[in-house]
């Protein structure tokens, strides 16, 4: 059975690119462009992992992240942060303070996206 990935990204071109790349790795991928409905989509879709953009209008990625982590039904889903914030401090906050499972900076390469997505599942099994 294919692993299900939910991509929460307001930029349609980026969301479609991520979807295309991950589908070549035999993942089932769904995208959410509107951050306001993201948490409900997580509950409905029940993904095995989430790739979450931080800078979105209306509801930012950190707020979505907190809502997922505070919901008993979906708290266990691994989350990789997608962001243009490439400073070491930002990554430290994402991984060590917020407890994201991975941190992917934009622009990212195809192989980095693939590797970090696979890593989400290796972490989940340990």
Features from the language model and the residues they span:
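Charged docking surfaces used in two-component/phosphorelay signaling
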Residues: 16-24
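Receiver (REC) domain active-site loop signature in two-component systems and cognate sites
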Residues: 56
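Short hydrophobic/Thr-rich beta-strand motif most characteristic of the beta2 strand and flanking loop
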Residues: 26-33, 41
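Active-site residues of response regulator receiver
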Residues: 53, 83
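C-terminal output helix
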Residues: 107-118, 125
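Active-site beta3 strand of CheY-like receiver
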Residues: 45-51
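Conserved acidic carboxylate
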Residues: 9
